[in-house]
Each structure stands twice: as structure tokens, then as C-alpha cells.
């Protein structure tokens, strides 16, 4: 049985802490857990207890412009495009995920500068 749990809410209310705790609990019960951090201020790695040296190895999806264009059909940081809402996501978690305590973590990444464009194609890959 596959289950997707999405958590959203106001900033500073403990979403990352809750998600990290749930992910670790599910993993400790033997479930395969993929945790996805789509927060521009990504802190789920810390909530999962990843050591600093492992956090520095995280490669974010938003950095992969060619992958995003290939899978969604849209150029990154451009407006007014039509793109696939159901892109092929095969291999993404294996390639970009980092494992710790039974949880595989994938991080979207942050908008680096004001006016950086729409992050819609990147976000579609996370569905």
C-alpha cells in the first residue's frame, strides 16, 4: 500500500519537525519512506537528523535545469509556458535522494533571487 501525506501551513508552526518525526517513525516501523522538502527554506534534513556533512551532499532538483525541461517540457524560470502535469519521475528519488535512518530525502531547492521566475515545472516533478 502506498500512501502520500502532504503537510502545509503557516511559517514557523513546526511542519518540518512534524514531517521529520513522522518519516522517522514510519521508517522505524519498516515502511519505505520518501520525504520531499519543497520549502524554499528547506530544514527537513535537520529535522531528520542528517549530520552537517551529509546535508552538504544534498543536490536539489531545482538545480537540474536540463532534467526539468526534459521531464516537463518547460524551460526553467520562464513564464507563460505549457508543461506536462504528469511528468516521468522514474529514477529521481534514487538519483537525487539522500538516505538517513531509513528515510530517503529529496529537496526541491530555493528561489535564489528575486524575479527568478516561476518554479512550477520544478514543483510538478515533486507530485
In which residue ranges do the predicted regions lie?
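Walker A/P-loop phosphate-binding motif and the immediately C-terminal alpha-helix
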Residues: 3-40
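Short, glycine/charged-enriched secondary-structure capping and boundary segments
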Residues: 21-22, 48-51, 120-122
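Gly/Ser/Thr-rich helix-start
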Residues: 10-13, 50, 118
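N-terminal phosphate/diphosphate-binding loop that engages ATP/GTP or pyrophosphate donors
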Residues: 25-101
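Short, electropositive, low-hydrophobicity segments enriched in small/polar residues
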Residues: 13-15, 53, 113
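Conserved beta-strand scaffold positions in the cores of enzyme catalytic domains, especially
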Residues: 103-105
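Cytosolic-facing regulatory segments adjacent to core modules
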Residues: 81-96, 107-127
Amino acid at each position: 500500500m502506498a500512501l502520500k501525506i502532504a503537510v502545509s501551513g503557516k511559517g514557523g508552526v513546526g511542519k518540518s519537525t512534524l514531517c521529520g518525526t513522522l518519516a522517522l517513525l514510519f521508517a522505524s516501523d519498516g515502511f519505505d519512506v520518501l520525504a520531499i522538502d519543497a520549502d524554499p527554506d528547506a530544514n527537513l534534513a535537520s529535522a531528520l537528523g542528517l549530520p552537517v556533512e551529509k546535508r552538504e551532499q544534498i543536490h536539489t532538483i531545482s538545480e537540474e535545469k536540463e532534467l526539468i525541461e526534459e521531464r516537463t517540457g518547460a524551460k526553467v524560470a520562464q513564464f507563460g509556458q505549457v508543461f506536462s502535469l504528469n511528468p516521468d519521475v522514474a529514477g529521481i528519488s534514487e538519483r537525487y535522494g539522500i538516505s538517513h535512518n531509513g528515510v530517503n530525502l529529496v529537496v526541491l531547492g530555493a528561489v535564489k533571487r528575486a524575479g527568478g521566475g516561476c518554479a512550477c515545472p520544478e514543483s510538478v516533478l515533486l507530485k
